[in-house]
Amino acid sequence: MSEPIPLIVAQYELKGHPTRTEHWNLVAIISSSQTYTFEVRGNTDSFTYVAEPTPVPLNKILMYRGGCQVGGIPTHSLPQIAEMLGEIPIVKHDLSWDCQTWVILAIKLLKSAGFVFAQVDEPYVRERLLEDMNRWEEADLTVDERLLASGGESS
C-alpha cells in the first residue's frame, strides 16, 4: 500500500473579479512534476467542473501564490475523488457562488470520506492561505515546495 499523496488548496492571483482576488482549486501533489487538479473554471454563467492532470509544476504557474495542505489521498483514489467531486452541484448566475465556494464544499465532502484532516474548515483554510501568500511575497517556500522538500509533510 502506497503512502497518501498531499492534497492542497492552491491559490492563484485573480484579476477582474468583482469580489475575489484569488482563484482556488484542489491539487493532489504526486511528484515535483506531476499533479492532479480538481476545480471549477469559468464565470458565473459558464462554471464547469474539471478534474485533470496538470502539465506544469505549480511553482512554474505564473499566477500561483501558494496554498495549504488539507489532506492526503492514495494515488489509486484519484478517479474516485474526481467522480465524487463531480457530484457537487454547480451554481450558475449567482454572484455569491464561485470557485472558493466550490472548494469549501469539496473539502466538506472529502472530509466526510476521510481524505481531509479533521481540523480543516473554512477559517483554517483562509488563515493558512494568507500565511502562504505572505511566504510567497517574501520569496519563501510555498506549501508545495515545503511538502516536496520534506517528503510529504507540510510545516
Q: Language-model features: where?
A:
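Non-catalytic ligand/cofactor/substrate-binding and regulatory segments of enzyme domains
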Residues: 1-97
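Activation targets extended, charge/polar-rich intrinsically disordered C-terminal tails
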Residues: 86-155
